[in-house]
Every structure is written in structure tokens, then in C-alpha cells.
Amino acid sequence: MDSRLLIVNGHPDPSSRRYCAALCDAYAAGVKSRGWKADRLEVGGAATPAILRAQESCDVLLLRNESAIGRICDADRLAIVFPLWLGAAPHALQLLFESVAQAMDPQQSPIAADLVVTMDMPALLYRSQIRTTGKSGAPRNPFYLNGVRADQTTLIGSVNVMARSEREAWLLKAHALAQRAVDRNVAVGRRSILGWRVPFSMPAWFTQAISRREPRIVSGH
């Protein structure tokens, strides 16, 4: 069976004119260049309308998003692209992954993912704010999503004033990021098959705790 990576566009507006949509396209191209299948889930599209109805019960929310939840749980890996809204992921995206966590087996480890986050402010400035709030007792990872283990978080700052050349450069980086993500998964699989590393699944409570810590930010603007 072909390996499958699901790209989640977390922007509430699924328009192809949005920069998040362009980043998803670039990531998908990188995945396909490595021979993997790249599926796409639009949080702001018709596929997940119920996540915008915050007044509904969690049971109804879970039922109506069964298709989206199933696609997330069946993926070998995730890439989640979203804009920073009010200091965190958009509420609709958070609600979707709360439903994912409810649907997962309690003993199942979180799904590995790369996060790509766009924002209006400079990324380095925001990163310094994350560390400051973490020391004051607030949650250390503002990008935490239920059921997800973020292996890598990429911040793209100042998108509202970014030149066209810079935007295109970030699209190339997203393409390369996808290729590295696939290469890492393939390398881990080969080591396990050859016996170089004994497969070991960390307890769910431990991986969830790790996911809540300050994100591992590998690039910023």
C-alpha cells in the first residue's frame, strides 16, 4: 500500500488565493516528488461544515465530521498549515482535532505532523513571546492540537508585508520541508525493518505531554 500524507489547510477561508493554500500546494508537490500520495483536507470547506457550529454538542460534532476524522486517523503523517489567530490556531481547527482525539484509541500515540504557521508579526518576535509566556505559567505550546505530535514547527512571519520574492522563497522551503518529512519516515521504516532500532511506542500520556511543551521551531522570518 502506498504511504499517504494528509495536508490539512487550517485556514477558515479555503480560497486558493490565500497564502496558506499556496503553501499546501507546495507541500503536496514535495510529497509527490518522493513517491507518496498527498491528500488534502480543507477545514474551511464544505467537507467539515459542522466544526463552525460551536454551540452543538461534542457527540453531534464528532458524528458529522466522521469523514474528516477518518481521513486524519488513516494518514501515515500529517502536515497542518494554518494562520495564527489571536495567538493560537483557528478555533475551527482546534475543534476538529478535539473530535479526532475523541475518536482515537486512548492508548494510541498522537499522529506525527509538521506544522506550518503564518502570522502578521515577525516570527522571531513571536518566538520570544512564546518563551516569555511559558515562564509565566501559561501553556508553553500555543500551537498544541489534540491528537497531534508536532515533529517540526515552521513559523512564517510578516506575511502581510512580505515581498513576492520572499513568498516564493517560502514556497520552495515548504516543498523541501515535505521532502525531508517523507525521507525521515522512510529512513525510520528501513531501520526498523533491518533491526537497527527496536520499534517502541511511547505511552500516549507521555507523548501528549511532550506535545504541549514549547514547539521545536526550525525556521523563522
Summary of predicted features, one role per range:
Residues 37-42, 148-157:
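Short beta-strand elements in bilobed, periplasmic/extracellular small-molecule ligand-binding domains
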Residues 76-77, 112, 152:
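Well-ordered beta-strand positions
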Residues 1-103, 161, 172-221:
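N-terminal beta1-alpha1-beta2 submodule of the flavodoxin-like/Rossmannoid cofactor-binding fold
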